[in-house]
Design a protein with these regions (language model features):
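Short, non-transmembrane amphipathic alpha-helical segments
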Residues: 123-141
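Surface-exposed interaction regions that form or flank ligand-binding interfaces
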Residues: 1-92, 132, 141-146, 153-191
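Canonical phosphoinositide-binding patch of PH/PH-like domains
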Residues: 117-125, 146
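Short acidic/polar capping segments at secondary-structure boundaries
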Residues: 96-97, 123-124, 155
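Active-site metal-binding core of divalent-cation-utilizing nuclease and nuclease-like domains
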Residues: 87-106
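Conserved, surface-exposed functional patches that form binding/active-site neighborhoods
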Residues: 114, 120, 133
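Active-site beta-strand-loop-beta-strand hairpin of nuclease catalytic cores
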Residues: 106-117
Length: 191
């Protein structure tokens, strides 16, 4: 089964895909080069050119893997707990948000009305910069007056998500389409 962007385990699945793809593509490049060398006895042949050009997609896969390698997927226990405590909220998991200055991992995000809350377990993630970046992207997409808060503390994030879930239980759910668009925008700025 394919893991879609925003589902738990996405980062792990992508890392495996990129690593396997890079290894296979470099193996093909080496095989093409060796075949050309064996056939002609020289590296100056057409298959060498094909092998060199074949390095481009292989290198792209390797760069994607190297970019994602330091980051982890959300822990299964935290995923289950969030699903249990906030069933009414729209959620997304395992994101690596990219801005022009930084690459910032975000384990989970919940969306309800005009509020977006996220949890980043990586201590190198700058909470304020990530929140500002998400808010700016949402503003650029005509979602003004959004409140974006990123937490490093899982307990604080979970209590905020529970509070948002309680508010969602009381309010009518006419904003689901809007929340799905907000979630899609956040996923679009993620690797």
């Amino acid at each position: 089964m394919r893991t879609e962007k925003g589902q738990p385990g996405y980062v792990k699945a992508r890392k495996q895909k990129y690593l396997l793809g890079a290894v296979v593509e470099f193996a093909i490049v080496i095989a093409i080069f060796v075949t050309g060398y064996i056939q002609t006895g020289s590296r100056l042949n057409l298959l060498t050119v094909v092998a060199v050009v074949g390095c481009l997609p292989a290198a792209k896969m390797l760069v994607e893997f190297i970019t994602m390698a330091p980051y982890k997927s959300i822990e299964e226990a935290k995923y289950q707990e969030l699903e249990e405590k906030a069933p009414l909220l729209l959620k997304a998991y395992d994101m690596i948000i990219t801005s022009s200055q930084k690459v910032m991992p975000l384990d989970a995000v919940v969306v309800s009305g005009h509020i977006v809350c996220g949890y980043a377990s990586n201590p190198k993630t700058d909470e304020a910069a990530l929140a500002r970046h998400i808010k700016d992207i949402l503003k650029d997409n005509h979602y003004d007056k959004m409140t974006v808060k990123i937490f490093h503390d899982y307990t604080a994030f979970l209590s905020r998500a529970e509070g948002m879930n309680n508010m969602a239980a009381v309010e009518q759910k006419e904003s689901l389409r809007r929340e799905k668009k907000i979630r899609k925008i956040i996923l679009n700025i993620s690797m």
